[in-house]
């Protein structure tokens, strides 16, 4: 029995599982029969190509099935192989999924489905199933460990419709230093969007919307820190960025209504109930929309 067979001899993962099948194909390759020959460069292209073929044309139902397979693979797979290979395999898979969802498709429906399918794991940043905290490389290359998180990528590209969904699920509130996201929105240089060729004016409008959304989530936004960066020679993407940060986030007392929103959202966030838990509250629809960052 070959070493690769010994490593992957038992599994509780069904044969129809995309990731189990992909792993089987990799370890059965003649060139990978001995551990000493295994290397990132040997299997990364095959993993990427296999998943890219699916993700390029997948619809929401197909993406749902793919995420279900990945969750089952991570949770139930009985495969046994070296820790380094396990890390490489899962990171390549996650990098490919995030790359296609955020950098290639840029579809809010796919982003929301990813958040819904993995929300039970989001409180543990180290979990392989907490996909929203994993990093990916926006211009695909086999180096997922040196990438950025989806939230930072969306802030860089100012995709306001996707940014809003991430915030509704409490992703910004979970950030240790949310001011870094604000700084990215204001100061990060314009970059070419992969999927949609929009005018610079549209990017400016999206940046304004992203700033407004941040003000609905945060109680404090350090304008002083932004100005410090400007004094060092950095240039804002919108000249009137100051107009989109309420004075109650950096100078005047914060509104009581906004503090109530933050308190309720924080309680729901603690119980992993954002955003669905908002709509189970017995309050008027307008207040539900306020809590859900619609207004």
UniProtKB/Swiss-Prot annotation:
Superkingdom of the organism of origin: Eukaryota
Tagged with keyword Translocase: no
ANK repeat residue intervals: 146-176
Source organism of this protein record: Homo sapiens
Protein name: Ankyrin repeat and SOCS box protein 17
Domain comment as written in the entry: The SOCS box domain mediates the interaction with the Elongin BC complex, an adapter module in different E3 ubiquitin-protein ligase complexes.
Pfam family, one: SOCS_box
GO CC terms, sorted: cytosol
Family: Belongs to the ankyrin SOCS box (ASB) family.
Pathway listed: Protein modification; protein ubiquitination
Function: May be a substrate-recognition component of a SCF-like ECS (Elongin-Cullin-SOCS-box protein) E3 ubiquitin-protein ligase complex which mediates the ubiquitination and subsequent proteasomal degradation of target proteins.
An example Gene Ontology biological process: protein ubiquitination
Tissue-specificity statement: Specifically expressed in testis. Not detected in other tissues tested.
